[in-house]
């Protein structure tokens, strides 16, 4: 009996993969892809000044306009519950990392009304120049199928509103 050659094995594997892909596509199922978003703003303040304002986990209620209240559990890991000013939306977020030295924290959504899953975000402050800092808000998430644009627009609006408020608080 003749051993299959590498070419034959590769050809057979390629055919199986192609058939599998065709079967997957014929089911009208689309693969899930993670999306990323990052926004930043330069602020006329020192790193320490900016971090003291935005660093506490529940300080978000002071710089994110839609947030009416923030309640922090204080456990480990810390959780916060955000309720919008109109009371119509609630977000529960878990802090997953925090670095006072790195002037950053990361969090995930435990529950959210936004059309996303697997949301993970980081807010950090970095020095830019003398008396100027940059606030960076970034995330990865999986948008709900058919809601990709809605998810991106909602998150972009949230990030831009928050960053604009941070900048305004330090504008002289």
Where are these regions (language model features)?
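Bacterial N-terminal signal peptides that target proteins for export
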Residues: 2-19
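C-terminal segment of classical bacterial N-terminal signal peptides
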Residues: 16-31
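Hydrophobic ligand-binding cavity/cleft-lining segments
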Residues: 27-74
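A generic structural signal for beta-strand entry/edge sites
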Residues: 34, 77-79, 102-104, 130-134
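Soluble non-cytosolic domains of exported or imported proteins
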Residues: 41-48, 54, 115, 149-160
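Hydrophobic pocket/interface hotspot
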Residues: 50-53, 60, 80, 95, ...
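Hydrophobic-ligand binding "helix-grip"
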Residues: 72, 86-130, 140-142
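A conserved amphipathic terminal alpha-helix motif
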Residues: 134, 140-172
